[in-house]
Curated annotation (Swiss-Prot):
It is found in: Mitochondrion membrane. The gene is GEP7. Its main location: mitochondrion. It comes from the Eukaryota. It comes from Eremothecium gossypii (strain ATCC 10895 / CBS 109.51 / FGSC 9923 / NRRL Y-1056) (Yeast). This is Genetic interactor of prohibitin 7, mitochondrial. Involved in respiratory growth and required for cell survival in the absence of prohibitins.
Length: 234
């Protein structure tokens, strides 16, 4: 009796039901396929709205980051973070070697520093704390990001000019290599125009050559004497 109850309570395998439906011609399989199609369609429709919602979420996250950064900047909390990270002995001046080794830091800190420097750039430079002046200067002209590898330490850092604006392409080895590479090669638009002009000239020259060699295209020009005949004396 117990064995019979245990067998009755066991669930029927799904594969067995599908085989039975195909064998008996039942519409259960068709209804299952239709329900799967409806679910997939609803999922596709939902994905159309997920893109806009993710964009709204990113915009809200950017606004939240900006508001949080400005709040920490005005309260002085972010200034203390900068001093603890980039200053050693003198709390009013950042150490250059600390900026060279630690800037811009993790992704979250980099985003906050970028928002803070953009916010401070609209304010009076003279009223800006000394540490923020240094961070803003290094953020704009430092050897990080696209200027990685350029020397920043010295009287006249590479890739930045204080008084002399001559010979910009000779300021550093990377700029000189870029200048020489760009001076030897044409840009894509100039190459396209040059190739098109060469193709048109070649087609015109070949057409002229074929016309000269084709006997059917040659004509004989008759020279007519159009001089008026002299009248005989009467």
């Amino acid at each position: 009796m117990k064995r019979t109850c245990a067998l009755a309570s066991r669930a029927v395998p799904k594969s067995l039901l599908e085989r039975q439906a195909r064998r008996t011609g039942s519409k259960v399989g068709a209804s299952q396929e239709a329900s799967k199609f409806v679910v997939a369609s609803l999922r596709d429709i939902g994905s159309l709205f997920s893109g806009s919602s993710s964009g709204d979420d990113e915009e809200q996250e950017a606004l939240r980051l900006h508001s949080d950064t400005v709040s920490k900047l005005n309260s002085g909390e972010l200034t203390e973070v900068v001093r603890q990270r980039y200053c050693v002995d003198n709390k009013d001046r950042c150490e250059t070697r600390m900026l060279l080794t630690k800037y811009p830091g993790p992704a979250r800190e980099r985003e906050m520093l970028q928002v803070a420097t953009a916010e401070l750039s609209a304010r009076d430079w003279r009223k800006m704390p000394r540490v923020w002046q240094q961070v803003s200067y290094y953020h704009a002209f430092g050897s990080w990001g696209p200027r990685t590898g350029l020397s920043f330490v010295g009287r006249r850092p590479e890739d930045f000019f204080v008084t002399d604006q001559k010979g910009l392409w000779t300021c550093s080895a990377p700029r000189r290599a870029e200048y020489e590479r760009s001076s030897r090669a044409l840009d894509p638009a100039s190459r396209a125009v040059l190739y098109a002009a060469a193709l048109v000239a070649a087609v015109a020259a070949l057409g002229d050559l074929w016309r000269r060699q084709d006997a059917d295209r040659q004509v004989t020009v008759a020279e007519l004497d159009l001089a008026e005949p002299t009248s005989s004396p009467t």
